[in-house]
A protein has these predicted regions:
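Short Pro/Gly-enriched beta-strand edge/turn motifs at strand-loop
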Residues: 41-48
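Charged, well-structured alpha/beta interaction segments
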Residues: 52-54
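Zn2+-dependent cytidine deaminase-like catalytic core
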Residues: 72-129
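Short, compositionally biased leader-like segments
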Residues: 12-41
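Intrinsic-disorder-associated, low-complexity terminal segments enriched in Asp/Asn/His/Tyr and depleted
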Residues: 6-11
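Short beta-strand scaffold segments in enzyme catalytic cores
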Residues: 56-65
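Methionine residue identity
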Residues: 1-2
């Protein structure tokens, strides 16, 4: 028999199915607007702020806000690797803390190894998947 409190919560919060979709555009640089190219370049520059002594994989993110501001983030590893912070979360948390009511319109992600920037988009970290 189900405890009354649990049964009551199930009836109170009718379960429903929600579907969330995300669209990702993979473009060549010549297909981007000038503003979008600025955001990509900001993401590349943000790689310079990465602290990635363990993975040697620097990730930079730039977010374009609806008011035209750009917020950046980079991955931050620590001695408890791999439980650092990914660049996406750093940028999103910073945007949320500094501009909580301003929507994000665009996210650009750049990844760099010791050989240079990756030629293909990188996958999200394990925490973001």
């Amino acid at each position: 028999m189900m405890p009354f409190q649990y049964y009551h919560l199930l009836n109170l919060f009718q379960m429903k199915y929600l579907e969330i979709k995300t669209c990702i555009s993979v473009c060549q640089p010549h297909e981007l607007s000038e503003k979008e190219m600025q955001v990509v370049n900001a993401a590349k520059e943000a790689c310079n702020n990465s602290s990635s002594p363990y993975s040697l994989f620097s990730v930079g993110v730039a977010l374009l806000l609806s008011d035209g501001k750009v917020v950046i983030g980079s991955n931050q590893e620590n001695a408890a690797y791999p439980s650092g912070m990914c660049a996406e979360r750093v940028a999103l948390y910073q945007a949320g803390a500094l501009f909580p009511k301003t929507p994000i319109t665009t996210m650009a992600i750049a990844a760099r190894t010791q050989e240079g920037f990756t030629p293909h988009p990188c996958t999200p970290c394990g925490a973001c998947r």
